[in-house]
């Protein structure tokens, strides 16, 4: 009989259970993790041998949601899950970024982590459960995974930090932060916040990592219970000191000189030439392979750049550690877009556009933890030309989806409420040049583009990427890092915010030993840089434009009696179809009686609004109206009021002495004045005749029809 090894523990207000040994026994390792009713099954499979010529660590993470987990059928024609949705991509990245730093640099075997969501309590998000599951599965796998990690979601409600807040609690929380880390170090942070101070952000990170120790202790206990032996893997030795000594002796000065070239393109060309010279000299003559040589060159590059920075010398492009690259800002460069900006920071450039749409343009998101409508879209594109390469243009990659979501988090806190600005907003950031921090350039460009579009954001937002060089007890925090400083450094810490506080951050750390002091210095330097950038942005545009673009749709709202909605729509949609065609406007009606008229032409919109008001006008007893005669009969006159409602003037309500013969005194199409005397339970209107002031009445009738 199959028997599982189980570890159960309290984690905040949740009960977490980790089981292994009963399901998917042919995988390298597999665990089922439950947090209350949310269950995620995580497997790890690793190849025994690395692929020939492998030059990087091929870790693949697939987080996949199953709709059966909430008792529903998938949408679409085939009624089964298809390509990964945005949330699946984002959670896959969270898992990857949390565990990747804990593998040896010389481990190149293929590893695949699959996290399958099997049951969901809508109040418990599966993302944290998945990261815990990946940590547990890797710890039980026998792979060279350094140590278990924990992961936690942190909220901030009523000035208190909350561990793993529910979906409902997050609505009132000023913070939504995920912290992953080992018992010694924070490894990954992802957060959005409602303009919190740096002090609160630091406290939340430290609080989260302290809570992570609960998970780590229990994974260690499970590991002792399960007692799986470590697998034998051939960890390639890439440290050939003899060859490195020779390469350094012959090429060190050339490599060092190349890192004095501030322009990225020229520097990369010089380094590429040096690499080719080294490979030509050593591969054929010294019984070495290309991977080993490239690893040695990387070590030399790392040593040169890091020693230069740690000793206080200028960085690759000549800047000091706290300097932001030169900024160049332009607005409205694309005349037919609703808003646009070109934001350039050094050799990183983002062309950002804003498009305004209606509620119909909003994105319907079918989520496991609750369906929602997203009226703010942020798309980030990273074409190959931005780094001077030839590449394949395809659907958005994981990195593009992740960067777009990060930039969106940075902007959310300043976006207007739907009641104040009833538009769906789409921002697109086209990265036209890249040398580090392109996602942060997207945030700055988005803020500028929104203001150019006349979107009433509450404040400007800027983003900055911080880096770290740490050697033993010495460390230097770098402001506005280049691509090479990210690649050769120890940290990538992106911070977004206004002058008042932080709106979002993302942190990936490659080493252990990141102290609270380093985090504090990073946040303080990021604040200074952010304010400097905001000062430059304010010189170009300080507040949103008063008017939206003439090419953007105008949205006009009126409220009608919900019972009149059927009159505006008409039988089979005939009335609303006629209105949209005649006024060249789009009309949206909500159940509460809110009517939106959308048009780029104000005259057309006003015409549509007037017609809707006429249709929904409620006729009142004892009020005098202008009417047009539609029929004449022996017993009276039928007349149409301004809202196309027909009423009867009985002959008894027409002065007999003055109009003894109604056929001779009245004609069809004549404008008359009437008084409403009764509306019966069937809606039939009884009128009395009050006059025939032709000029005045005709003018009034034409004005109102």
Curated annotation (Swiss-Prot):
Does the record carry Phosphoprotein as a key word? no
Q: Which cofactor does it need?
A: Mg(2+)
**Protein name, as recorded:** Polyribonucleotide nucleotidyltransferase
Q: Which GO terms describe its molecular function?
A: 3'-5'-RNA exonuclease activity; magnesium ion binding; polyribonucleotide nucleotidyltransferase activity; RNA binding
Report the enzyme's class at the first EC level. transferase
Quaternary data = Component of the RNA degradosome, which is a multiprotein complex involved in RNA processing and mRNA degradation.
Which chemical reaction does it catalyze? RNA(n+1) + phosphate = RNA(n) + a ribonucleoside 5'-diphosphate
Which residue intervals define the domain S1 motif in the entry? 622-690
The catalytic activity of this protein is classed by the Enzyme Commission as 2.7.7.8
Keywords from the UniProt entry? Cytoplasm, Magnesium, Metal-binding, Nucleotidyltransferase, RNA-binding, Transferase
Q: Which domain of life is it from?
A: Bacteria
S-S pairs: none
Which residues span the membrane?
none
Where does the protein principally reside?
cytoplasm
Q: Which GO terms describe its cellular component?
A: cytosol
* Task of the protein: Involved in mRNA degradation. Catalyzes the phosphorolysis of single-stranded polyribonucleotides processively in the 3'- to 5'-direction.
